[in-house]
Amino acid sequence: MTLKPIRLRPEAELEIEEAFDYYLRESPRIAGRFLDEIASSLKKIQRDPQLYPAYTKNTRRRILGSFPFSVIYQEREEIILIVAIAHAKRREGYWTKRLKQ
């Protein structure tokens, strides 16, 4: 089975960086755990994109276990597009405009 490549929208990359920087100020260990959980989530999504429930706007969502974030993604023909790394406290659907770009 060939795995589809993962592509992150620039905004999703920025969300990871901002969260990492926040956790790094709190604790380098927590920041490392955050990155580990993101990496693990991306691997799980890549192995089985259909594993996580349908969300909105033709997306799926994987909720992180230890952090208040969700990975919002679309499975496309050639790739898996990571649309957002959405904090639970942000306005729901703030990322939908990214789907049109």
Walk through the language-model features, giving the residues of each.
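Arg/Lys-rich, positively charged N-terminal/basic patches that mediate binding to nucleic acids
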Residues: 1-35
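Basic/aromatic recognition patch in beta-strand/loop cores that engages polyanionic ligands
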Residues: 40, 47-80
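Enriched for short, Lys/Arg-rich terminal
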Residues: 1, 70, 74-101
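Short amphipathic alpha-helical/adjacent loop interface patches that line ligand
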Residues: 16, 20, 35-38, 42, ...
